[in-house]
């Protein structure tokens, strides 16, 4: 899904798949806007197939630390994946000069473009993407398989920002 690059995009895509997998029903709307945004901590709770599904998205390490402290103190319970600003703020993105970063919220603009693209896509659910279905059936096996995990997960490498 194109929204993977925005903070909360992976969570939103995962919710689309999880809800349909758990209920066996097609979603009336694929937009989970409560988990969108490039700042702070976004928490949401959904009733799915008689279960409460609680999710949170933290933008940046400061917010991740706050969320981890909430878990540590027994105030919240979540599983984690951390991306400061999402992929739209990652080391693989074009770097902007300091004067642009100081005057323009590039992350918000990039996120808006991704959500606009997502709205115009015919296929908006990862589990319905024919290319993904083909990849799993011919190469990776089942979602969550050892091969899929090994090939599709990475580790963080700090990148220097120019400018």
Language model features with spans:
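Iron-sulfur (Fe-S) cluster-binding modules
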Residues: 1-163
């Amino acid at each position: 899904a194109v929204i993977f690059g925005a903070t909360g995009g992976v969570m939103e895509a995962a919710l689309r798949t999880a809800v349909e997998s758990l209920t066996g029903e097609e979603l009336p709307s694929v937009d989970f806007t409560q988990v969108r945004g490039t700042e702070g901590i976004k928490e949401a709770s959904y009733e799915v197939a008689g279960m409460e599904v609680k999710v949170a998205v933290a933008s940046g390490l400061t917010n991740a630390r706050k969320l981890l402290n909430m878990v540590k103190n027994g105030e919240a319970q979540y599983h984690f994946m951390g991306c400061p600003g999402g992929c739209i703020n990652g080391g693989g993105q074009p770097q902007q000069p300091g004067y642009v970063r100081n005057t323009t919220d590039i992350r918000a603009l990039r996120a808006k473009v991704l959500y606009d693209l997502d709205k115009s896509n015919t296929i908006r659910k990862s589990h319905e993407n024919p290319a993904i279905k083909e990849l799993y059936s011919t190469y990776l096996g089942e979602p969550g398989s050892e091969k899929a995990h090994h090939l599709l997960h990475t580790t963080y490498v700090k990148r220097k920002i120019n400018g």
